Amino acid sequence: LLFQLRTRTPHELWLVIVDASASTRRHQALSDAKGLLAQLFDDAYRQRARLALLTASGSVPKWQVQGLKASSGLRVWLDALGAGGGTPLLAALEQAGQWLTVRRKRFPAEQQRLLVVTDGRLKQWSGLPALRCPGLLIDIERGPIRLGRAKDLATELDAQYQHIDELISL
């Protein structure tokens, strides 16, 4: 008898950090981001990727999902997502860095990806955690006066940068 080992490609984990602070309410930024996230969740489901979802709003970041397979249950969360409160994005990035490190030890073959959705409206930051995985920062800042901090944040996170308007026009 011959036994054949199943060859499986390593699982993918998509870590999504969503800035849902009050400033993302302006100019329909969060609404458009929700449409983009709905598409992302559908793609994750089709590709059988695992998702980790961290929301940065209020005073502390909150984990919604940690490493589960994408499912239709995320649609309920997405529909209820609203903007408000402060911007604990830096705390969310810190938590994400710690969580990814632990996860990497537990699942060394897993391919991790990072997506940060933010308007970048932070007062200041220093010493961002090294997340050590490919990343994309989607800038949802809109309006006549743009601070442009999301691009700087992407550079410091060693992530690619894309403005949401460029993605919507595709």
Language-model features: locations:
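An active-site-proximal "capping" alpha-helix that borders the catalytic cofactor pocket
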Residues: 31-54
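C-terminal "exit" segments of structured domains
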Residues: 168-170
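Short acidic, Gly/Ser-rich segments with clustered Asp/Glu that frequently serve as metal-coordination loops
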Residues: 20-31, 121-125
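Short beta-strand/turn micro-motifs composed of small residues
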Residues: 18, 55-57, 116-118, 139-141
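Acidic, polar low-complexity linker/tail segments
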Residues: 1-15, 23-29, 46-47
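Von Willebrand factor
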Residues: 61, 69-112, 121, 139-148
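Structural motif
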Residues: 13-15, 111-115
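VWA/integrin I-like adhesion module and closely mimicked acidic/polar interface patches used
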Residues: 120-165
